[in-house]
Amino acid sequence: MNKIKFLDKTLVQKIAAGEAIDRPCSILRELLDNAIDSGADKIEVFIEEGGIRRILITDNGSGISKEDLKICYLPHTTSKINEEKDLERIQTLGFRGEALSSIAICSNLMITSSITGENSYQIEIENGIEKYFKKQSAINGTMVDVTNLFHNFPARKRFLKKDSIETKMCLKVFEEKAVTHPGIDFKLSVNKELKKVYFKESLADRVQSVYGEIIENNKFGKIEAEYDHVKMKIFFTPPNFSRKDRRNIKIFVNRRPIEEKSLSESIINGHSRILTYKNFPVCYLFLEIDTTHVDFNIHPQKKEVRFFNLPFLPKQISNNINEFFDREKQEILQDYHNVIIKRQLTNDAHLLHPENDLTNSNFKTYEITQDEDLILDKPKNNKVTNIIEDKVKFEGQISQKYKPSFKQHIQKIFIKTSKMPNNFQKSTQTNEFKYMGQLFSEFLIVENANEIYFIDQHALHEKIIYQTLINSEKTIQKLLVPIEFQVECEDTDKILTSELEEYKKIDIIVKKIQNQTYRLESIPNICNKYENIIIQFFKTRKSKIIDSLETELYATLACRQAIKCNDTISLEFSQFLINEFFNLKLKHCPHGRKIYHKITKFELEKSVNRQ
């Protein structure tokens, strides 16, 4: 009797499905790949109960014809490749023809689709078997609805995490697809609540939108490079935003997230001179590689990759990052030298006022080259552009020819409130603290008794402005010319409409003219000249505020008007901020972030073994 036998067809499909689909986020990844490959520029995702109960994706892509819809769920059916040679030049995210068949085996699957100008059709598959196929109301693109995941795989279902954890995994996949496709509008709803919205933007802006919350003030550095068969973009944070694990090192090759140890190690090596042991950088690497030099067909979920004839790549990544920080270090030292000279030559200690010239623009550009034999210690030919995005946006930039008085400067920052605070004076330094100076154009260093404070100048100034706004006497001010504006997102439109009466309570009159179109008619007097910020606040509404609209709005205004990182401020204004810090005992900015970090003399002495 033969011991070896052919497996049942259904069992074979279940085994294959288990390799490609192991949890809800795997389904989401495959369906997003299909939507992106369809040429869609708008994709919406709906998740319920961590994706276990339901994952619904709609797109406005090219759609599926009636004939293709009838067979799209069968194993190894695909429109992406035709022959073996196609595996060497894969341009799409999907290509194996396994995704829909695997999903159909382990869930209930319903697909509705149409090609432009043709009727829509719907097919439902249960446990891999077609349940029905019918004509459907016309839609633009494709809708894929997956329900009851693993209902026929009880063993696999038992190993799923609780809904909240599965939701986080789905969110991670959603963000990875969104960040690598900035030319697509993405929208995510979880349990019928809108969670994420990303509109079309540049890659740099999309990185800020998706990952900007990891660091304060969205301060990313950027390197761009191009070599034979490779285009490279690296986004990274300053050294002070290091992490204790590697989770924020992300690598994308041809718009796919991958796990490649050699590349992650090259990123870590590039930061080795600026990060201490067991600290890891926050870094996002984007590579576009000629398809003949890369193979994704080595892992069921395409998480691994094999490179051909690119031995220089890891070293190049490391060298570029190292050289970037070497140049930054030299600039910091030079800037420090310039500041010392300016302190000696100026009486009023106004330092480094922003100017509209290249030296103070928002981007610093460097060029590196690559030598011919690909030994990359000192590249020579191809250009690398390093950009540091300071995002300094000071209301009314000041030229050197005109320097306003201190009082004028403060009045502008404090939005011309009706009464200036009593401590807006050219006061000398108090005896309670000793101001040591400004660090990295970001922190104020203060000695107080036996303690040293590192105070975040932006967070502190933001809190002071916020309290001034909240506590000021307000009157309603009618705009001479009402401002009309539109919101692009339907969910934002619904939220804004529901909040119109709440805005009236804080002296903001905004009326809805028609669908997604509004008119701003009145604002509080203290918000004079900041209509644009208020309108931007309206346009970015993503969820209803639980606590207070007034709190959220004034926190936004304060954040936009406060001094930023890399703003060098006068000695007098620094002392004013520090006085307010100690007098008001401020601890957190309006958004909840800590304002300062404190080190005691004992802790400092202990760190150098003096205790």
Swiss-Prot record:
One example of a Gene Ontology biological process annotation = mismatch repair
Keyword vocabulary terms for this entry:
DNA damage, DNA repair
- The coiled-coil regions, if any, are none
Q: Which domain of life is it from?
A: Bacteria
The UniProt GO MF terms for this protein read:
ATP binding; ATP hydrolysis activity; ATP-dependent DNA damage sensor activity; mismatched DNA binding
Q: Which SUPFAM superfamilies match?
A: ATPase domain of HSP90 chaperone/DNA topoisomerase II/histidine kinase (SSF55874), DNA mismatch repair protein MutL (SSF118116), Ribosomal protein S5 domain 2-like (SSF54211)
**Pfam families, alphabetized:** DNA_mis_repair, HATPase_c_3, MutL_C
Q: Which GO terms describe its cellular component?
A: mismatch repair complex
Q: Which HAMAP family match?
A: DNA_mis_repair (MF_00149)
Q: Which family does it belong to?
A: Belongs to the DNA mismatch repair MutL/HexB family.
PANTHER family, alphabetically? DNA MISMATCH REPAIR PROTEIN MLH, PMS, MUTL, DNA MISMATCH REPAIR PROTEIN MLH1
Q: What does this protein do?
A: This protein is involved in the repair of mismatches in DNA. It is required for dam-dependent methyl-directed DNA mismatch repair. May act as a 'molecular matchmaker', a protein that promotes the formation of a stable complex between two or more DNA-binding proteins in an ATP-dependent manner without itself being part of a final effector complex.
> What is this protein's record name?
DNA mismatch repair protein MutL
Instruction: Tell me the organism.
Output: Borrelia recurrentis (strain A1)
**Highest classification ranks of the organism:** Bacteria, Pseudomonadati, Spirochaetota, Spirochaetia, Spirochaetales
